């Protein structure tokens, strides 16, 4: 978590209360929850830090999405316990296992559920008074808005904005609805207000997230209103607005038109398709998706010729035959996605898929994953190569101290999951500061990243001065 290791004082300018350390695990939705807890504690006068050595109490915001994530969360907790830290366990693992964590970890002084992190100050005060606290609602109902304090942990120019919490779908492999409850959308006015706040903080890229962002508004307005939300965000002075987690059946003509017509909405579509074969999708409890996958992708490319397409896939789902896997491999080769993530199936206790017969051998699942990733590499390389020669905006995020090169991203790359743009240093040593956006010309490419050079000295000087 990119936060200063030095204790951050509360808003009164001095840490009159103890410093609390934070460890963040899991997805960007979890990150936003962490940022709200940081903001609440800071406002209450606590110091906050990512350096566990400066604090006796550590809040660990955990992940419980798949077995690997649970194991990482438990390793983190045990490691901190071995250091003698008092633990406040928040997030999905706390929601999932609740009292079991308190019983198995004496160092755990509190557990805080996914719908209860807004009470973190009260929880900490009770811990300081000697209580062991269980603050986990059986059914999460809370959703934060722009009024809840927030201390961002991303770089200055990038922010995630959670437009809804929870999920109404029940995909057979997914534990999230059990951990985060049903969908609760925020009003459009609330989201736009927070977007304006973030713009005032210097944010250049705003990433809209939820469990299924294309379902935004269905619970609140009686129909999905992502298109209306994107239109409203068109008036916010943030140059890049990116949408993550678009369920394919929710990409209506109205939504695709908003991608096309709202100038600051990037034509970047994150589509977690999971599979292509109708029988596998039916077993995943996504039966309607098989009828729309290819038709939808054709429609997107027709209406958004510059669309950048990312998807995630699951291999080794119970009962997946070699023939069904070959169907998926053919789909991947045919559709030529820009970016692809592939996961092997992880059985999650409490999900329908965990009880399905005919599990796929782990070695076979891993081999299928490797084959898809190998198949995708030349596709991604060719997609990147098509950008060579273009002049694009790049958001600078860091400098390479050894070479002087600037490292950033263009619109085709989302943070963390996609590639980077490596911008050659100028002979005069002039650099754009992190958080600034500059025009660059793409000069080279590989499977994952692009290489570029700066376009025009005047723009560089302006960017450098704007950062002073």
From Swiss-Prot:
Binds 2 [4Fe-4S] clusters. One cluster is coordinated with 3 cysteines and an exchangeable S-adenosyl-L-methionine. Keywords: 4Fe-4S, Cytoplasm, Iron, Iron-sulfur, Metal-binding, S-adenosyl-L-methionine, Transferase. Its cofactor is [4Fe-4S] cluster. [4Fe-4S] cluster 1 binds at residues 27, 63, 92. [4Fe-4S] cluster 2 binds at residues 167, 171, 174. One of its GO terms (biological process) is tRNA modification. One of its GO terms (molecular function) is aspartic acid methylthiotransferase activity. InterPro entries: Elp3/MiaA/NifB-like_rSAM, Methylthiotransferase, Methylthiotransferase_CS, Methylthiotransferase_N, Methylthiotransferase_N_sf, NA-bd_OB-fold, Ribosomal_uS12_MeSTrfase_RimO, rSAM. It is found in: Cytoplasm. It holds the Pfam family TRAM_2. It catalyses: L-aspartate(89)-[ribosomal protein uS12]-hydrogen + (sulfur carrier)-SH + AH2 + 2 S-adenosyl-L-methionine = 3-methylsulfanyl-L-aspartate(89)-[ribosomal protein uS12]-hydrogen + (sulfur carrier)-H + 5'-deoxyadenosine + L-methionine + A + S-adenosyl-L-homocysteine + 2 H(+). Residues 18-129 form the MTTase N-terminal domain. NCBIfam families: 30S ribosomal protein S12 methylthiotransferase RimO (TIGR01125), MiaB/RimO family radical SAM methylthiotransferase (TIGR00089). HAMAP family: MTTase_RimO (MF_01865). This is Ribosomal protein uS12 methylthiotransferase RimO.
């Amino acid at each position: 978590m990119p936060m200063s290791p030095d204790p951050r004082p509360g808003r009164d300018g001095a840490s009159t209360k103890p410093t609390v350390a934070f460890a963040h695990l899991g997805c960007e939705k979890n990150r936003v929850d962490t940022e709200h807890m940081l903001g609440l504690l800071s406002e209450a006068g606590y110091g906050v830090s990512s350096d566990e050595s400066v604090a006796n109490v550590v809040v660990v915001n955990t992940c419980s999405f798949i077995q690997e994530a649970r194991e990482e969360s438990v390793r983190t907790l045990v490691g901190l316990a071995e250091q003698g830290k008092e633990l406040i366990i928040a997030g999905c693992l706390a929601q999932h296992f609740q009292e079991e964590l308190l019983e198995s970890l004496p160092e755990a002084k509190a557990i805080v559920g996914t719908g209860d992190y807004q009470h973190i100050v009260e929880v900490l005060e009770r811990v300081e008074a000697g209580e062991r606290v269980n603050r986990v609602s059986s059914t999460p109902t809370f959703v934060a808005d722009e009024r809840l304090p927030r201390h961002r942990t991303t770089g200055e120019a990038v922010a995630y904005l959670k437009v809804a919490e929870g999920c109404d779908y029940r995909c057979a492999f997914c534990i999230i609805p059990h951990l985060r409850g049903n969908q609760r959308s925020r009003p459009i006015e609330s989201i736009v207000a927070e977007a304006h706040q973030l713009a005032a903080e210097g944010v250049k890229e705003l990433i809209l997230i939820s469990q299924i962002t294309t379902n935004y508004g269905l619970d609140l307005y009686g129909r999905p209103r992502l298109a209306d939300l994107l239109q409203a965000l068109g008036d916010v002075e943030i140059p890049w607005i990116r949408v993550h987690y678009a369920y394919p059946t929710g990409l209506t003509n109205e939504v695709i038109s908003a991608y096309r017509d709202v100038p600051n909405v990037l034509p970047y579509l994150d589509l977690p398709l999971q599979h292509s074969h109708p029988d596998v999708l039916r077993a995943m409890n996504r039966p309607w998706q098989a009828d729309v996958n290819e038709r939808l992708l054709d429609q997107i490319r027709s209406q958004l010729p510059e669309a950048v397409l990312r998807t995630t896939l699951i291999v080794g789902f119970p009962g997946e035959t070699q023939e069904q896997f070959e169907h998926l491999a053919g789909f991947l080769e045919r559709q030529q996605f820009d970016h692809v993530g592939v996961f092997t199936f992880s059985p999650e206790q409490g999900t329908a898929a965990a009880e399905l017969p005919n599990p796929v051998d782990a070695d076979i699942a891993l081999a299928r994953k490797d084959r898809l990733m190998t198949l995708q590499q030349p596709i991604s390389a060719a997609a990147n190569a098509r950008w060579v020669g273009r002049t694009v905006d790049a958001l600078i995020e860091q400098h390479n101290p050894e070479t002087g090169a600037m490292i950033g991203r263009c619109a085709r790359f989302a943070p963390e999951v996609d590639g980077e743009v490596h911008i050659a240093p100028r002979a005069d040593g002039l650099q754009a500061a992190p958080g600034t956006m500059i025009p660059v010309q793409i000069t080279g490419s590989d499977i994952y990243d692009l290489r570029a050079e700066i376009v025009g000295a005047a723009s560089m000087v302006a960017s450098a001065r704007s950062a002073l």
